[in-house]
Amino acid sequence: MTATLQQRKSANVWEQFCEWITSTNNRLYIGWFGVLMIPTLLAATTCFIIAFIAAPPVDIDGIREPVAGSLIYGNNIISGAVVPSSNAIGLHFYPIWEAASLDEWLYNGGPYQLVIFHFLTGVFCYLGREWELSYRLGMRPWICLAFSAPVAAATAVFLIYPIGQGSFSDGMPLGISGTFNFMIVFQAEHNILMHPFHMLGVAGVFGGSLFSAMHGSLVTSSLVRETTENESQNYGYKFGQEEETYNIVAAHGYFGRLIFQYASFNNSRQLHFFLAAWPVIGIWFTALGVSTMAFNLNGFNFNQSIIDSQGRVINTWADIINRANLGMEVMHERNAHNFPLDLAAGEVAPVALTAPAING
């Protein structure tokens, strides 16, 4: 008697699905993180496009003064945005089913929460997917570590800052001029330009751009000649070739003489680690700075630091910045505040306790 064992079809289908999901032979790697990444990013993108084009005005400050952000309501690509959810909602989770009607959900800025939560979930999964693909291919895991810098920055402005300030209405609007408005108000309320972590972020971004340009120009200037004058130098490289396509010794010698010897890397691995680490660490610091300023641990305050022998203030650039901050602060959300915080926080002015006698 012969016995045959046959696997259940459902288990076989599941195994095939798992194999397909984790296969590195697919044109685009999916992975288990991709199973969550794809629908969340599609949802965020779809809602963003629809809201940017057609969303009705949103009562962002919670004072019944809706702000229009969509193209249909008169904006252009520069001025348009998905407006953050209402200050009346605060930090409450506000999905569609929490609103009494779709009109109410739109009026209170529900699409903003839908977009940022799906977007953040999607980019977290994209980071995980980078690690997953590196793992499958036997690569080192530093690609996802580099991507963690922009992920941290997005998390800071869309999630940590609203949590610290107590309302998603303080999150960054999803648009060009909305981003600039966020930056201006952030400076007015937190003096971010005087925060050391923001300074490190500026050094990271500008320094990274400089180093990238320096590296690219040095490599391009020291290519090994493989072509004639009549054809593109790009034809001198064949994908997968074993030989170096540029002369690192020549590049090292040039740059070492241009600056000084030890300003130039003589190790290609150290060089490329430096090119990756510099901007990543800078952006990490900026994200950390925004996350601390979310809880009002603000930039340095050097206002009225210098006074003369008579006690009069000698203005410095810090005082000029402070004056600009006050101007920006009193102008933003101008109908939501009776007394802007900085102006209302001064010392109490003495007043007369009794009315003066009036003769006559």
Curated annotation (Swiss-Prot):
<keyword id="KW-1133">Transmembrane helix</keyword>
<feature type="binding site" description="axial binding residue">
    <location>
        <position position="198"/>
    </location>
    <ligand>
        <name>chlorophyll a PD1</name>
    </ligand>
</feature>
<comment type="subunit">
    <text>PSII is composed of 1 copy each of membrane proteins PsbA, PsbB, PsbC, PsbD, PsbE, PsbF, PsbH, PsbI, PsbJ, PsbK, PsbL, PsbM, PsbT, PsbX, PsbY, PsbZ, Psb30/Ycf12, peripheral proteins PsbO, CyanoQ (PsbQ), PsbU, PsbV and a large number of cofactors. It forms dimeric complexes.</text>
</comment>
<feature type="transmembrane region" description="Helical">
    <location>
        <begin position="142"/>
        <end position="156"/>
    </location>
</feature>
<keyword id="KW-0249">Electron transport</keyword>
<dbReference type="InterPro" id="IPR036854">
    <property type="entry name" value="Photo_II_D1/D2_sf"/>
</dbReference>
<dbReference type="InterPro" id="IPR000484">
    <property type="entry name" value="Photo_RC_L/M"/>
</dbReference>
<dbReference type="InterPro" id="IPR005867">
    <property type="entry name" value="PSII_D1"/>
</dbReference>
<dbReference type="GO" id="GO:0016682">
    <property type="term" value="F:oxidoreductase activity, acting on diphenols and related substances as donors, oxygen as acceptor"/>
</dbReference>
<dbReference type="Pfam" id="PF00124">
    <property type="entry name" value="Photo_RC"/>
</dbReference>
<comment type="function">
    <text>Photosystem II (PSII) is a light-driven water:plastoquinone oxidoreductase that uses light energy to abstract electrons from H(2)O, generating O(2) and a proton gradient subsequently used for ATP formation. It consists of a core antenna complex that captures photons, and an electron transfer chain that converts photonic excitation into a charge separation. The D1/D2 (PsbA/PsbD) reaction center heterodimer binds P680, the primary electron donor of PSII as well as several subsequent electron acceptors.</text>
</comment>
<dbReference type="GO" id="GO:0009523">
    <property type="term" value="C:photosystem II"/>
</dbReference>
<feature type="transmembrane region" description="Helical">
    <location>
        <begin position="118"/>
        <end position="133"/>
    </location>
</feature>
<keyword id="KW-0106">Calcium</keyword>
<keyword id="KW-0460">Magnesium</keyword>
<keyword id="KW-0464">Manganese</keyword>
<feature type="binding site">
    <location>
        <begin position="264"/>
        <end position="265"/>
    </location>
    <ligand>
        <name>a quinone</name>
    </ligand>
</feature>
<dbReference type="InterPro" id="IPR055266">
    <property type="entry name" value="D1/D2"/>
</dbReference>
<feature type="propeptide">
    <location>
        <begin position="345"/>
        <end position="360"/>
    </location>
</feature>
<keyword id="KW-0408">Iron</keyword>
<feature type="binding site" description="axial binding residue">
    <location>
        <position position="118"/>
    </location>
    <ligand>
        <name>chlorophyll a ChlzD1</name>
    </ligand>
</feature>
<dbReference type="GO" id="GO:0009772">
    <property type="term" value="P:photosynthetic electron transport in photosystem II"/>
</dbReference>
<keyword id="KW-0602">Photosynthesis</keyword>
<feature type="binding site">
    <location>
        <position position="332"/>
    </location>
    <ligand>
        <name>[CaMn4O5] cluster</name>
    </ligand>
</feature>
<keyword id="KW-0560">Oxidoreductase</keyword>
<keyword id="KW-0472">Membrane</keyword>
<keyword id="KW-0813">Transport</keyword>
<keyword id="KW-0359">Herbicide resistance</keyword>
<keyword id="KW-0157">Chromophore</keyword>
<feature type="transmembrane region" description="Helical">
    <location>
        <begin position="197"/>
        <end position="218"/>
    </location>
</feature>
<feature type="site" description="Stabilizes free radical intermediate">
    <location>
        <position position="190"/>
    </location>
</feature>
<keyword id="KW-0604">Photosystem II</keyword>
<keyword id="KW-0793">Thylakoid</keyword>
<feature type="binding site">
    <location>
        <position position="342"/>
    </location>
    <ligand>
        <name>[CaMn4O5] cluster</name>
    </ligand>
</feature>
<keyword id="KW-0148">Chlorophyll</keyword>
<keyword id="KW-0479">Metal-binding</keyword>
<feature type="transmembrane region" description="Helical">
    <location>
        <begin position="29"/>
        <end position="46"/>
    </location>
</feature>
<feature type="binding site">
    <location>
        <position position="272"/>
    </location>
    <ligand>
        <name>Fe cation</name>
    </ligand>
</feature>
<comment type="similarity">
    <text>Belongs to the reaction center PufL/M/PsbA/D family.</text>
</comment>
<feature type="site" description="Cleavage; by CtpA">
    <location>
        <begin position="344"/>
        <end position="345"/>
    </location>
</feature>
<feature type="binding site">
    <location>
        <position position="126"/>
    </location>
    <ligand>
        <name>pheophytin a</name>
    </ligand>
</feature>
<feature type="binding site">
    <location>
        <position position="344"/>
    </location>
    <ligand>
        <name>[CaMn4O5] cluster</name>
    </ligand>
</feature>
